[in-house]
Amino acid sequence: MPLPKIEDARKLNDQELADEIVAVKKQLFDLRLQQGTGRLEKTHEIKHARHRLALLMTVERQRQLQAQ
């Protein structure tokens, strides 16, 4: 699975962006929980979730700065 693209995040509206950030944070929590209990087989999924979260938060911050 390739890493997500920033263009995909920029297409989301503000509410979808906020919902996606919450969903990725939950996914990251679940992945870390699985890693801690030794049940995580695809460890690269943590990297993908962190990358996606950073990407979404960057887009959110860019929109905040544009609104000022």
From Swiss-Prot:
Domain of life: Bacteria
GO molecular function: structural constituent of ribosome
One of the protein's GO biological processes: translation
Coiled coil: none
Single GO cellular component term: cytosolic large ribosomal subunit
Keywords: Ribonucleoprotein, Ribosomal protein
InterPro entries in alphabetical order: Ribosomal_protein_uL29, Ribosomal_uL29, Ribosomal_uL29_sf
Annotated SUPFAM superfamilies: Ribosomal protein L29 (L29p)
Family of this protein: Belongs to the universal ribosomal protein uL29 family.
Matches recorded under PANTHER family: 60S RIBOSOMAL PROTEIN L35/50S RIBOSOMAL PROTEIN L29, LARGE RIBOSOMAL SUBUNIT PROTEIN UL29C
Name listed for the protein in its UniProt record: Large ribosomal subunit protein uL29
Source lineage: Bacteria, Bacillati, Cyanobacteriota, Cyanophyceae, Oscillatoriophycideae
